[in-house]
Amino acid sequence: WLFDGLKANGGKWDVIGMSLYPQADTWQTMNTQCVANIQDMISRYGSEIMLCEVGMPWDDAESCKNFLSDLLAKTKDIDQCLGIFYWEPQAYSGWNAYTLGAFDNTGKPTVALDAFKE
């Protein structure tokens, strides 16, 4: 409804930014829904899309890697999808009560970020 209202009133934008923060038991469904939403936004508004914020709990790094690998694979062939940014990957467990980073308690990156190297 937001972009419909903006478009109807002559609003303009360069890129639509999206966020996605699934859990280990929801990422498959949420990735599918996110890709459908990306395709809908492109179709409806002709806009480029960027996943500006993604993340999962740091202590389930393997699930997070699977989530990211799947999402990267599903979006890489969508020309209008500009990319994916992990939000605050350097955050470690409990940093300012934020638990969705991709570093462990020793301050090292988890395997979650390996998805970006594939």
Regions found by a protein language model. Name each.
Residues 33, 40-46, 58-118:
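Aromatic-rich peripheral "rim/lid" segments of glycoside hydrolase catalytic domains that contact
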Residues 1-63, 73-77, 81:
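Glycoside hydrolase catalytic-domain groove-lining segments
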